[in-house]
Amino acid sequence: MANWARTDYRIEGNQKDLQEIYNLCKAFDNSERPVMEDGASKDWEGNIILALGIEKGESYLRGFIQSCELSDGLLCIEAEEAWGATDFRHLLEKHYNGMKVYYIVEEDGCEVYATNDIDGKYFAYHFIVASCIEGE
């Protein structure tokens, strides 16, 4: 059984491109579009990738979109992903010219904490402390 990681994405790019991704997220979430592979969940990240015509090949796509919001030219996606960040961000950046996908991932079980936002543009904290006090 997988350890589930929370991954938050902040996606910058052309407004038309961001709107396209957002529209697909909402269409799958509202069951307005059928899933792209037999047995797939409507919130599987791969639906977006395949609907965009991207060849996923051997890409690691074990994530499920929990929320998707587009506001002020920024697309915000929250996902649950198995073990850590998936290839979702890489596939989007390769598909769209000028797109930048910032992410932060937290998976407590295997202590996976990572980000590519080194300047803190969207994810300002650089440290995460998990502590447990015996008896509490």
Short names for language-model regions:
Residues 25, 39-136:
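Charged interaction segments
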Residues 1-30:
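Short, extreme N-terminal segment that most often corresponds to the first beta-strand
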Residues 35:
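Pyridoxal 5′-phosphate
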